[in-house]
Amino acid sequence: MNMTVFLLAAVVLLTGAAPVFADYQKKAEEATDYIQTHFYDAPAKRYRPSFPVDPKALPYDFMWANGVQYSAVIAAARWNPAKYRKLLTDFSDGMESGYWDPQAPVPGFNAYCSGPGGTDKYYDDNAWLAISFAEAYKNTHDPIFLKRARETQKFVLSGWDETLGGGIFWKLDHHSKNTCSNSPTAAAALHLAQLTKDKDQLAWALKIREWLAGTLQDKDGLYWDCVTTQGKVEKTKWSYNTAMVIQTDLLLYQLQHRPADLRAARRMADAGLTYWTDPATGSLQKTEKSPRFTVYFCEALLRLYDQTNDKKYIDAVRHQADHGYRVARDPQGGYWDNWKDGSHHPDERKSLIENAAAARLFWLLVPYTDPNPGM
């Protein structure tokens, strides 16, 4: 029995936590419908940041949360198009009309729905969207999504320069180069390379991947947060950063069939399971309370399971989903921000980004029908 499976088994025995392996599509639809009921402004085709609404806050959420929600809606439209395909179209229109800036030197999505001429743009926000647009195109074959993916990726790649030997900046102020702006850009480039046979995108992915490994990878295989233009490395290890490098290496393996890429992906995934698995619960929330980061690591583990058929990866994701459902869900089907132990203040508002991460996680598990962990 491998260490990860042993840990999950021990957690169940010691805590008495009954597995809640159930219909993940039902859970995904419940989470998605909760968001539509409590966060969505249908006339504006945009999402509010919290529920209950905070009267002191901006009326709509920032692009980071929208990006997570967009990925959840894309998955929803894949698995239940009759119910959610129109929502995908409407939400796409709402983002484009409110957040897309066609007047920028290189058009891209603003951080907030401030309209044309905005000066607050994040390269990472746009990189996540480029990946999502590519996914939407794969699912629907609607050329508008491929067009959006290419346009958005063009903006992200404009954030590269040779300061610090290369790399893409985090945002327009050009103060730091972050793993969260580089790793999803490399993955987006490879998705586009798969879809269009664009060799330039493959070249970009390889260049970004090389810079990341030489600049922001720790000896254990995991990735630090960022490096400032003064050369100072911020060494927090967010799970979503390593997750996107794992996905990048898996895409490289699919395109180039180099065993070293698959080995690198497995090494990072195994190091991540060791680093982020909470020994008290078996969840992936040892160092992070929020699912907004771990959902990306879960997706990376599922993609690695697809490639290797190693059940420790899917078992970890199932356990994470079941843990979140058990500790962070309220009786109405919404999710609290804290997935580590579910504790929250009585007056705490629920946030769009955490609920979107929950919905995305459950949608990711829909195609995996085996209800039992591999123990």
PLM regions: where:
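Sec/Tat signal peptide C-region and signal peptidase I cleavage site
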Residues: 18-21
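Oxyanion-binding "anion nests"
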Residues: 241-256, 261-275
